[in-house]
Amino acid sequence: MKPLQYAIIGGTGVYESGVSSFQKTVETEYGEVEVDIAEVKKDSIVFLARHGKEHGTLPHRINYRANLKALQKLGVQQIFATAAVGSLNPDFPTGSLVVLSDFLDMTKQRPLTFFEDGSEGAKHVNMDDPYCANLRKHLLEAAKRHDVQFKGNAVYICTEGPRFETEAEIKMMREWGADVVGMTSVPEVVLAKELGLCYASVGFVVNMAPGMDSGPIQLESIGEMLARNKEK
């Protein structure tokens, strides 16, 4: 098997790599993680379904630390992730793709760090480039080669979930500068940074956030948008 330098973390709607692969169980101090190992051209790539293959794990119950530790244990250095998002920005309509460039954190009860007990001393990870600029550049270059259009860079705000946001919350988030909202990129991006892993994420806009269009969020419409974006 070739070295495992790259990983894809599939979010809502992306539950498999789409190529021939075999399953592997990785043991970590935070629990077991199931991944798929796929060979793509000259590289072996790890695929991890964030919510599980059947989407059985809600955002606030995902074992983010186990997932990231498993990838590190396999030797992964670069992670490409996907995330279904709601749009707070009229320039990012339903069905569009964005590249996450920064984040705001509104999560409440998730383990956010590998350094909880202080046994390694005070650890303050620099977050001035949370979503790796180099990987974002590669994403945009690959998209151009394959005629896939990104609407632009987006500031992502992460909520606890699993409920959707209120109109009042969305109004506040827009004032804070958020472009899209989701429930999973934090603490994933933070934990990757703590482990020294390069991490980038594509946002699939599956709905306009509450108060941004004429009606309530329709789960059926979200499913349709996920299927459409998966092909991209």
Where are these regions (language model features)?
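Metabolite-binding pocket within alpha/beta catalytic cores that recognizes anionic/polar moieties
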Residues: 1-127
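Short, flexible loop segments at the rims of nucleotide/cofactor-binding pockets, characterized by
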Residues: 55-60, 157-160, 178
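Short, hinge-like loop/turn segments at secondary-structure boundaries
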Residues: 96-101, 198-201, 217-220
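Short, acidic/turn-prone active-site loops that include or flank metal/cofactor-
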Residues: 102-105, 204-210
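Polyanion-binding loop/helix "lid" in catalytic or ligand-binding cores
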Residues: 120-131, 170, 225-232
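Active-site rim beta-loop-alpha module in soluble metabolic enzymes
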Residues: 130-175
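A C-terminal functional module that forms or caps the active site or interfaces directly
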Residues: 167-208
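His/Asp/Glu-rich mid-to-C-terminal helical/loop segments that flank catalytic regions of hydrolases
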Residues: 210-232
